[in-house]
Amino acid sequence: MVNELAILSNMLDIDIWEVVDAAKTKPFGFQSFRPGPGVGGHCIPIDPKYLSFKTRQIGQPVRFVELAQEINNSMPNYVISRISELMNKQEILLKNSKILILGVAYKKDIGDTRESPAIDIIELLLNKSAEVSFHDPYIDELTINKERISKEQDIDNFSNYDMVIIHTPHTSFNKIDFENIRTLIFDTTGSFTISNAERI
């Protein structure tokens, strides 16, 4: 639900992160949910499909669960639309642009890419003829559709890139001096305080 609210908030020119922060001031009953690029791992993206399959067999589909899956599955496309919009404002074409993905694991501080939204995001970027590299301290190699994705070793200098997409908020990324980066930054997790970045 929070991903759908993030999309709606952007359309209404409302900062979803300010909304979440305001909700935190409620003295009781608040559970924080944060938008992101989708869901990954071997449980959340997969297990509800079994439930949906079984409930459809008995003629009682779980519509809310299926709608949540649909929205979460659409988030990589939403990320692409947002970065395209940001780049267009700077008169940078997505085609042939150089894009760096920071973090490709499905969650922070692990080296697991199963069902990671980063895979879909990279695939979409490649389909649009962007040149994509990644950096993830927990993952040494990444191959998508038989294409090996270049790993960037130097994360102190992003000047070679047109766009940096923060996908996974690994703790080690806290050491990066994002404030002094002049490259476009899109933070899909809202985990970093970066004055010059756009957040999902």
Predicted regions and their residues:
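Structural/interface elements that position substrates and couple domains in central-metabolism enzymes
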Residues: 1-200
